């Protein structure tokens, strides 16, 4: 086992603080509408230019192991905030730095670190309650566009695209962001449920020009097992023929005699039919077939449930307004399932998303949720160069998460003002002793820092502007750093999602309080590398 180096008390906290400062100072220049860019060297390809706090934080690795510990702890704040809220990473980093700095001073003055932590926790709880009380629900498309624009650093085009995407696929719909091959940014929306399985045979095609199957108002048979013979299905097929409606068969596989019989019937014109394989594999396939059944108001025919194919009636089949099948995908539009059943299924999937620990499972569950809840939107981000496209794609990702967060918990005035207004909530806190009161005061000073930093990045005097803001008691009144004016920020469209502000504060306080209460640091001793032996003389 390698030898370890140990640092204690003041020495330990000083090293941590240096690391925190190095990382936070690099990140905080990006804060606000007039924040600057950070250029990151890449081991291959062009350098990356970004204004995304978490991207900058993830690139920082310090040589001194003890300083690096401090930097990594604050990097954790940015990552956690990014995971939970998708934005607010720079605000969280700035808050963490402020709390650690103020806390280190208090500990150096001889205060009890544990009481300071309790005071910090009380203050954070009071501000979070204040933020929740003042959060305003998002209702209009314009508000969504404003939030997306701000989170994309003032890019109005991105804001408009995101608002359109959310309007079309709903709040639970999946929005994916890709790099475009052209200069223009474009939006493509797939309505209804789409899964990646095409027709089992090209003979099913009804639109020869586009090589796809198009059915209006079809019946949908959802079968869990393979279909290799149609003997047991004949009564059902006769009933479908009499109804005059088309039939879509979704099964694990349709092969041999069954496929041949369906193709022959299709070509003779007696039966409008198409067959596709069921999406997914294993347990996920069962779940997706159940999703299709709920969406279309049908029943998944499964031997587990004791339903045999010969007993299936038309009432057990799903219905949809339209089905489109091409070589690779099947899209079911306007399924006839009851809204209540679909909502119950959506709630069930949401609970599974919360409980799962696997990122892969979470992603697949979110895809299923989106397919049930309304559709999938793809935003293709364009730009003149690869560097520009990557930078814009980062901003679209941020904006998308911020917009979702706003719809979830509502909005607050931006520009760091919501945190400033939380100062009043701190006055009502009752503390047990002077050290806890000092903990509350640490947060009192820290929550002024984001607003000050935004103003400084815009080239104004931070302390002067914050002083002016505190003189005015109107909740939404603040400094618009983009225009350099004092105004009602909510009316001006300078808004932040409540979830982003709340998460940034809670994550920052959580990690900063741990750093304040740190008394020892342990790291591996750097290995002394032996000098390389001298090369032999050339005439050897």
UniProtKB/Swiss-Prot annotation:
Pfam families: Cpn60_TCP1 (PF00118)
Positions bound to ATP: 30-33, 51, 87-91, 415, 480-482, 496
Subcellular location, record wording: Cytoplasm
Keywords in alphabetical order: ATP-binding, Chaperone, Cytoplasm, Isomerase, Nucleotide-binding, Stress response
MF-aspect GO terms: ATP binding; ATP-dependent protein folding chaperone; isomerase activity; unfolded protein binding
InterPro entries: Chaperonin_Cpn60_CS, Cpn60/GroEL, Cpn60/GroEL/TCP-1, GroEL-like_apical_dom_sf, GROEL-like_equatorial_sf, TCP-1-like_intermed_sf
Entry annotated with the keyword Ubl conjugation: no
Catalysis performed (reactions): ATP + H2O + a folded polypeptide = ADP + phosphate + an unfolded polypeptide
A GO CC term attached to the entry: GroEL-GroES complex
EC number: 5.6.1.7
Annotated signal peptide: none
Induction, per UniProt: By heat shock.
Any one GO biological process: response to heat
Record's subunit section: Forms a cylinder of 14 subunits composed of two heptameric rings stacked back-to-back. Interacts with the co-chaperonin GroES.
HAMAP family: CH60
Similarity field: Belongs to the chaperonin (HSP60) family.
Stated role: Together with its co-chaperonin GroES, plays an essential role in assisting protein folding. The GroEL-GroES system forms a nano-cage that allows encapsulation of the non-native substrate proteins and provides a physical environment optimized to promote and accelerate protein folding.
Protein name (record): Chaperonin GroEL 1
Species the sequence originates in: Bradyrhizobium diazoefficiens (strain JCM 10833 / BCRC 13528 / IAM 13628 / NBRC 14792 / USDA 110)
Gene that this polypeptide is encoded by: groEL1
């Amino acid at each position: 086992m390698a030898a370890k180096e140990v640092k204690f008390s003041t020495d330990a906290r000083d090293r941590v603080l240096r690391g925190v400062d190095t990382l936070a100072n690099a990140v905080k220049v990006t804060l606000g509408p007039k924040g600057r860019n950070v250029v990151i060297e890449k081991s291959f390809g062009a350098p990356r230019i970004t204004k995304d706090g978490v991207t900058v934080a993830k690139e920082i690795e310090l040589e001194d192991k003890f300083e690096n510990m401090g930097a990594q702890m604050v990097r954790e704040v940015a990552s956690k905030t990014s995971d939970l809220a998708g934005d607010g990473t720079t605000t969280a980093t700035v808050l963490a730095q402020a709390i650690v700095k103020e806390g280190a001073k208090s500990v150096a003055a001889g205060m009890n670190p544990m009481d300071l932590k309790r005071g910090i926790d009380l203050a954070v709880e009071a501000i979070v309650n204040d933020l929740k009380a003042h959060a305003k629900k998002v209702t209009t498309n314009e508000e969504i566009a404003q939030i997306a624009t701000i989170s994309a650093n003032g890019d109005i085009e991105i804001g408009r695209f995101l608002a359109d995407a959310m309007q079309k696929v709903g709040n639970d719909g999946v929005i994916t962001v890709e790099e475009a091959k052209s200069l223009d940014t474009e939006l493509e929306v797939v309505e209804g449920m789409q899964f990646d399985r095409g027709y089992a045979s090209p003979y099913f095609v009804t639109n020869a020009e586009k090589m796809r199957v198009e059915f209006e108002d079809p019946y949908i048979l959802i079968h869990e097992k393979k279909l290799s013979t149609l003997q047991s299905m004949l009564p059902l097929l006769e009933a479908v023929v009499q109804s005059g409606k088309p039939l879509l068969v979704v099964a694990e596989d349709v092969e041999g005699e069954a496929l041949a019989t369906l193709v022959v019937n299709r070509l003779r014109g007696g039966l409008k039919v198409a067959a596709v394989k069921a999406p997914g594999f294993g347990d996920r396939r069962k779940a997706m077939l159940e999703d299709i059944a709920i969406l279309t108001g049908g029943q998944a025919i499964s031997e587990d449930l004791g339903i045999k194919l010969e007993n299936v009636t038309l009432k057990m089949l799903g219905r949809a307004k339209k089905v489109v099948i091409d070589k690779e995908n099947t899209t079911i539009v306007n399924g006839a399932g009851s809204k209540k059943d679909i909502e119950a299924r959506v709630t069930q999937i949401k609970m599974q998303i919360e409980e799962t620990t696997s990122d892969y499972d979470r992603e697949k569950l979110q895809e299923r949720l989106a397919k049930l809840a309304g559709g999938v939107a793809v935003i293709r981000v364009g730009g003149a160069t690869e560097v520009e496209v990557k930078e814009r794609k980062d901003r679209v990702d941020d904006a998308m998460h911020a917009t979702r967060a706003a719809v979830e918990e509502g909005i607050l005035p931006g520009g760091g003002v919501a945190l400033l207004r939380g100062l009043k909530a701190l006055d009502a806190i009752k503390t047990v002793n002077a050290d806890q009161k000092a903990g509350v005061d640490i947060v009192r000073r820290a929550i002024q820092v984001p607003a000050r930093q935004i103003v400084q990045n815009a080239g104004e005097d931070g302390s002067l502007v914050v002083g002016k803001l505190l003189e005015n008691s109107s909740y939404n009144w603040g400094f618009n750093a983009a225009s350099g004016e004092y105004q009602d920020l909510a009316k001006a469209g300078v808004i932040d999602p409540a979830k982003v502000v709340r998460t940034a504060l809670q994550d920052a306080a959580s990690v900063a309080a741990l750093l304040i209460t740190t008394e020892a640091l342990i790291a591996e001793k750097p290995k002394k590398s032996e000098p390389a032996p001298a090369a032999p003389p050339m005439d050897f």
